[in-house]
Amino acid sequence: RIPTLQEYIQICKKYGKKSVLELKNHFTPENVVRIIDIIKGEGYLDHVIFISFDYENMLTIRRLLPEQPAQFLTKEIDDTLIQNLEQNHLGLDVKHVALTKENIGQLHAHGIEVNCWTVDDPARAEELISWGVDYITSNILEAAVTPAACCRD
């Protein structure tokens, strides 16, 4: 059985986990408000990062919750995207193959948090960590991130 949003948030809360919540489809502002209200009802909004391939969803989140972590999902990075993310105070969640040490540095210089997906190779995870990526999405936590990599200063 697939949990409802409320049940999912309750599970995250029970185990003290950050929720990375993907808005998979385009949502009307009214529907985004309903989603936010469910999360607020559980008292867990401070532990949620919203992500979406739909840029309008991210703009709606930003309008409704100016300080809420929100990351635009994409496969590619270009200068226009960086400008838009910086202007709208959004983070980036990008396919890991698009990342380089240089563009991570460029994104950080513009105040943009960098998340990447999906990294299941330990060597690639270590490389991305050494480059300064902020988050890694993985299917295999134990294989993707070693304690030495995630706990270094």
Regions found by a protein language model. Give the residues of each.
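Metal-dependent phosphodiesterase/phospholipase catalytic core, i.e.
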Residues: 1-76, 88-90, 94-95, 108-110
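C-terminal active-site rim and adjoining tail of enzyme catalytic domains
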Residues: 1-2, 71-153
